[in-house]
């Protein structure tokens, strides 16, 4: 709900001298133990019920179905844009306070796992997409215990679809990879994407490793790819990146190319919520799943969140 603690306190303080002090709070459901409940909403409800909260307290719970300004047809349209197995559907549509737990991309994992029996996977494409307007590469640098990851993503015209074109992950668990060797891995990946799909419009890298980024720029220049635009990733809030990906999957606007994205498929099928985080939503990052590849993929789409939503 993006209600920062300092913002809440400041908003309250600004009304201390008001003649008719009123605070209106409108929000979507969150984690049941989020501070917005434990420190404010539920706390005030308890105090009011006990007669200890002066000034009054009103609480109403509404869902999408209670909105009289939205037609039934539009409500069904909105509901169809969510994966019914996701926490976003439970919260935004059903209005429930739920903990983020289990698989993050359950619908995707189900489609991949059932493919051996049904020979169908609705997220997989086998033919080269004809209408790509942008091809973006994301790079995440790993250290000991993780790995370096490259992901190439194609975006179709008018931001209608996300199509992951290729992914590659290099293990660093036994020691980091030499920067020159990493640079060559990067160049090989770029040429593979160029030869198969066409021009690369941008490369976004993990901004925490400026030395490695400069190394990629230098290697690219030496090997005929000096025109590549290699910049820092935006590093949007992780839950917002996850939310977009789940939303695109639910609307069948997310795909990946067959035989080219093994590391990404594995990463998505094993991504889970952190079971130890009872207050906030957090993706588990303890080495049991490939977070490097997930980050690299998300770097390719995070700058366009509003555009993907705008063209729904």
Predicted regions mapped to residue ranges:
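Mg2+-dependent endonuclease catalytic cores in nucleic-acid-processing enzymes, primarily RNase H-like
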Residues: 161-284, 307-308
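Short loop/turn segments immediately following beta-strands, especially the blade-tip
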Residues: 46, 154-158
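ASCE P-loop NTPase helicase motor core
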Residues: 3-82
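Acidic two-metal-ion nuclease catalytic site recognized across multiple nuclease folds
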Residues: 116-120, 301-312
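ATPase catalytic-site recognition across NTP-hydrolyzing enzymes
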Residues: 68-142
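Short His-Asn-centered micro-motif
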Residues: 1, 26-28, 139-141, 153, ...
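Short beta-strand scaffold segments in enzyme catalytic cores
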Residues: 147-154
């Amino acid at each position: 709900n993006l209600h920062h603690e300092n913002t809440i306190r400041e908003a309250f303080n600004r009304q201390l001298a008001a003649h008719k002090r009123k605070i209106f709070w409108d929000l979507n459901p969150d984690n049941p133990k989020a501070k917005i409940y434990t420190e404010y909403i539920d706390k005030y409800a308890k105090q009011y019920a006990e007669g200890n909260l002066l000034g009054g307290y009103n609480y109403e719970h509404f869902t999408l179905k209670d909105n009289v300004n939205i037609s039934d047809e539009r409500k069904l349209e909105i509901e169809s844009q969510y994966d019914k197995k996701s926490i976003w559907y439970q919260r935004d549509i059903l209005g429930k306070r739920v903990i983020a737990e289990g698989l993050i991309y359950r619908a995707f994992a189900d489609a991949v796992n059932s493919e051996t029996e049904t020979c169908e996977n609705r997220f997989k494409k086998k033919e080269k997409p004809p209408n790509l307007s942008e091809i973006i590469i994301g790079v995440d640098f790993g250290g000991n215990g993780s790995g370096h990851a490259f992901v190439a993503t194609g975006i179709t015209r008018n931001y209608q679809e996300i199509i992951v074109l290729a992914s590659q992950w290099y293990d660093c668990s036994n020691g980091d990879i030499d920067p020159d060797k990493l640079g060559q891995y990067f160049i090989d990946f770029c040429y593979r994407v160029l030869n198969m799909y066409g021009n690369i419009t941008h490369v976004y890298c993990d901004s925490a490793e400026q030395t490695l980024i400069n190394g990629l720029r230098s290697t690219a220049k030496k090997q005929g790819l000096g025109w590549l635009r290699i910049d820092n990733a935006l590093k949007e809030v992780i839950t917002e990146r996850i939310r977009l990906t789940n939303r695109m999957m639910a609307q069948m606007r997310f795909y990946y190319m067959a035989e080219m994205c093994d590391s990404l498929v594995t990463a998505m099928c094993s991504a889970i919520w952190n079971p130890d985080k009872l207050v906030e939503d957090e993706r588990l990052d303890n080495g049991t799943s490939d977070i490097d590849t997930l980050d690299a993929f998300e770097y390719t789409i995070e700058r366009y969140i509003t555009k993907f939503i705008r063209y729904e």
